[in-house]
Regions:
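Short helix-to-loop capping/linker segments positioned immediately adjacent to catalytic or ligand/cofactor-binding
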Residues: 41-48, 137-139, 206-207
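Short helix-terminating capping/connector loops at secondary-structure junctions
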Residues: 47-49, 141-144, 194
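Active-site/binding-pocket entry motifs
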Residues: 64, 120-121, 222, 229
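N-terminal auxiliary segments of SAM/dcSAM-dependent transferases
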Residues: 3-110
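Active-site catalytic microenvironments for nucleophilic, acid-base chemistry
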Residues: 61, 65, 165, 190
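Solvent-exposed amphipathic alpha-helical surface segments
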Residues: 36, 40, 134-138, 191
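SAM-dependent Rossmann-like transferase core, predominantly class I methyltransferases
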Residues: 73-74, 80, 84-167, 174-186, ...
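S-adenosylmethionine
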Residues: 168-170, 174-234
Length: 234
């Protein structure tokens, strides 16, 4: 037997046991993922509340299945290549401790989907709910807002929600990070809002155009360096 044959034989034996061989259905993989996440001590605070919800989301996303329809697929058998994809995702979450949003490359605020990656903080803001109501009662008529600013825009998610909440507004979205603005530009383009949202690279107001604003919103990173040391790995 050649060295190459020996390596191939070892690879075949690896697949005779373990999750790739023993876990067959979506239900099997869901149970396995929940156990792995719990044993790894994963933190859940980026839109999904526990190991089960995150396992459902990651498995359905990996298999390109509807995120709101688990039941019809629970006992579906998963081909070998897709099992490998699921195992890779589970390991990224449980071993590498990557947040689910960075694994899938997306995050949701309400019905709005946004691209995210490690260049930006994962969207998670109570401002989203306020913007759904046009920031009532502080703003009586959303259509009267014609100029608004999102300071520390990050992925651009709040600027995009502002554009929908205030249909007559032009939005200035500001961030100190060009990497973050690059992500924001992709999200803005995905919603066709390039004509209404202007991205500005600025340290605070330093490079912001001199103009008046009807509405200014800011949801900056608010964790101190000391607090960062005690945060979960995610």
């Amino acid at each position: 037997m050649t060295h190459e044959d020996h390596l191939e034989d070892e690879h075949d034996h690896e697949h005779e046991h373990g999750p790739l061989a023993e876990l067959v259905t979506v239900r099997d993989w869901l149970r396995y993922a929940v156990t792995r996440f719990n044993r790894a001590g994963c933190f859940f605070g980026h839109g999904l509340t526990d190991a089960y919800d995150e396992a459902v989301y990651l498995i359905l996303h990996t298999l390109s299945l509807p995120l709101d329809r688990l039941e019809p697929f629970l006992d579906a058998c998963i081909p070998g290549d897709e099992r490998e994809e699921i195992l890779e995702v589970i390991e990224k979450r449980a071993t590498d401790r990557l947040p689910a949003a960075y694994i899938t490359g997306e995050a949701w605020l309400g019905d709005f989907r946004f691209k995210v990656d490690p260049r930006v903080i994962i969207p998670r803001s109570y401002f989203a709910e306020l913007l759904e109501d046009g920031f009532s009662p502080w703003i009586q008529d959303p259509e009267t807002v014609t100029a608004a600013m999102d300071m520390c825009t990050g992925s651009g998610c709040l600027a995009i929600l502002m554009a929908h909440a205030f249909p007559n507004a032009e939005i200035v979205a500001v961030d100190i990070s060009q990497d973050a603005l690059d992500v924001a530009a992709e999200n803005i383009a995905a919603y066709g809002l390039e004509d209404r949202i202007k991205l500005v690279l600025s340290d605070g107001f330093a490079a912001v155009p001199e103009q008046g604003f009807d509405f200014i919103l800011s949801n900056p990173p608010y964790v101190t360096r000391e607090s960062m040391e005690s945060l979960p790995a995610e």
